[in-house]
């Protein structure tokens, strides 16, 4: 029996690799002779770098860069030498996990460090750069990253703008003369799981600003500032992309990557699946098991189980989901290739307990699934 194990990470609990290992351990109890193929997955957010580098036998590199609030951080990024491809997970340099909850500041946080990672990839001769842009602490429209790459932003008095999205309200003009010329020879791809525009009620500031520390007044100010930034970008760049799906991803980094770098926007799970060879692995399999921390209606928006189920469906392979919790609307996934879904806790349990005991719970649930499958096969 050939089983593909392709889960995402369980946030604040286990990495995708840890989830896959626990599921494999449970299946092995019942099917010791089964061919278990572990394909840890991600959707452009947390774990994307790790999943791609591990599956591609790439190199994990480290770079000291400027963090979201100006502090120096050691960020990891991936290098696939054979294809001269760099994997940059922006959360490594500009992520929410780098800022304690009490210090989160959507108004002044910057993506400058992400730009520094791009520059490091250019120094190594990258021909393709994949930007995984989930989990950001920033709301600067990607301005900081572009400044790190040579874009100059000035106010009316010819002073360089300080970091952060709020400062963009004072932008008077953009100078592209110092933009790194190597960028023109690189193919950029954005791997993300959101398709919001830059501005408006569904834009970066309104939807994601509050979780980054913005109050209602600041959300309004940031939205206006990003709109002002987009107005000026439209004057010096060939295309206005503010309303394109994904421009609001990562506090507007999606906008800057599209506008300045010509980046192609792709569903994060699609990019990861391609690089880890999921389609080839699923072909001929008897079962696919995937999962994530919370499985609900939001999964339909390009989350890992959705992407995995679509691939399995194309090959007629059944899919079972194991999730930390089953939320509202998860049943909708039954129309998109999922055959069954199970939550981890077998009884009342706190979130903290479920997270700490996730390996054991995953192993038990996987073993239970295998026993039911085996029993059904005997009939």
Task: Give short role names for the model-derived ranges.
Residues 1-133, 137-379:
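N-terminal loops that bind phosphate or other acidic moieties
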């Amino acid at each position: 029996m050939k089983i593909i194990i392709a889960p995402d990470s369980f946030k604040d609990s286990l990495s995708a690799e840890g989830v896959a290992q626990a599921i494999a351990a449970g299946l092995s109890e019942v099917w010791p002779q089964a061919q278990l193929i572990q394909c840890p997955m991600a959707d452009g957010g947390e774990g994307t770098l790790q999943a791609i580098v591990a599956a591609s036998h790439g190199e994990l590199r480290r770079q000291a860069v400027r963090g979201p609030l100006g502090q120096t951080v050691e960020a990891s990024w991936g290098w696939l030498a054979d294809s001269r491809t760099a994997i940059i997970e922006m959360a490594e340099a500009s992520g929410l996990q780098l800022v304690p909850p009490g210090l989160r500041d959507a108004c002044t946080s910057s993506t400058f460090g992400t730009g520094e990672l791009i520059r490091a990839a250019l120094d190594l001769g990258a021909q393709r750069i994949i930007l995984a842009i989930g989990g950001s602490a920033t709301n600067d429209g990607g301005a900081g990253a572009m400044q790190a790459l040579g874009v100059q932003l000035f106010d009316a008095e010819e002073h360089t703008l300080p970091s952060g999205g709020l400062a963009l309200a004072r932008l008077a003009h953009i100078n592209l003369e110092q933009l790194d010329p190597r960028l023109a020879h690189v193919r950029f791809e954005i791997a993300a799981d959101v398709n919001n525009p830059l501005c408006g009620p569904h834009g970066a500031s309104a939807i994601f600003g509050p979780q980054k520390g913005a109050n209602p007044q600041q959300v309004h100010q940031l939205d206006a500032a990003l709109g002002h930034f987009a107005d000026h970008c439209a004057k010096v760049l060939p295309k206005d992309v503010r309303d394109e799906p994904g421009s609001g991803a990562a506090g507007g980094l999606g906008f800057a990557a599209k506008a300045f770098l010509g980046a192609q926007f792709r569903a994060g799970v699609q990019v990861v699946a391609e690089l880890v060879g999921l389609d080839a692995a699923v072909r001929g399999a008897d079962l696919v098991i995937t999962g994530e921390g919370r499985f609900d209606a939001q999964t339909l928006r390009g989350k890992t189980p959705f992407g995995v189920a679509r691939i399995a469906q194309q090959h007629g392979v059944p899919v079972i989901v194991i999730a930390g919790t089953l939320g509202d609307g998860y049943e909708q996934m039954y129309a998109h290739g999922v055959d069954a879904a199970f939550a981890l806790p077998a009884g009342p349990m706190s979130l903290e307990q479920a997270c700490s005991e996730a390996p054991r719970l995953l192993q038990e649930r996987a073993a239970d699934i295998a026993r039911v499958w085996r029993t059904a096969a005997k009939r």
